[in-house]
Amino acid sequence: MQSLNDNIYPIFNQIISKREKENRLKQNAKCIWLTGLSGSGKTTLALKLEKTLFEQGFLVQILDGDNIRTGISNNLDFSENDRLENIRRIAEVSKLFVNCGIITINCFVSPSNKIRSQAKKIIGDENFIGIYINADLSTCEK
C-alpha cells in the first residue's frame, strides 16, 4: 500500500518568489504576531495597524484567534495539544500569506514559549515580528 506522502510533489521551487511578489506590491512582507492575555487589546491594535498600513497603500491581512476558531480550527479545544495544533495551522497559513508578499497581523494569546517558538520556526525567523501586549489583569477582565 502506498503512503499518502508518495503522492505529494511540492512545487515550492517553481512558484514566483516572495521577493518578486514583494517587489510587485512594493512592500516587505512580515508576520506581526501580537500576543498577550485575552482582552489585552491585540485585536483592537491589529485593526488600527491594518487601517493605517492600508491607508498608506500596503496590502495587509489580519488573522485573529476568534475568527480562526470559527473556521479552520473549529474542531479544536483549549487543551495544550490543541493550542499547539491551532498555532501550527495558523503559522502555516501565515507563511503562505507572507510568501505571497502580504503583511500579516496575527492576534493570538500564544501563552507559552513553546507555542511562540513553533510559530516563529514555521513562519521563519526573518519573517516573524513578535510583540507582547502588556496589559494588567484588571484591564483584561473588563
Feature map (PLM): residue ranges:
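ATP-dependent NMP and nucleoside kinases share a basic, alpha-helical "lid"
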Residues: 69-77, 94-142
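Conserved substrate/cofactor phosphate-moiety recognition/catalytic segment
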Residues: 47-95
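Walker A (P-loop) phosphate-binding loop of P-loop NTPases
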Residues: 39
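Extreme N-terminal, non-catalytic leader segments
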Residues: 1-32
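Residue-level preference for the first positions of well-ordered beta-strands
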Residues: 29-31, 59, 103-105
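Conserved lysine of the Walker
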Residues: 42
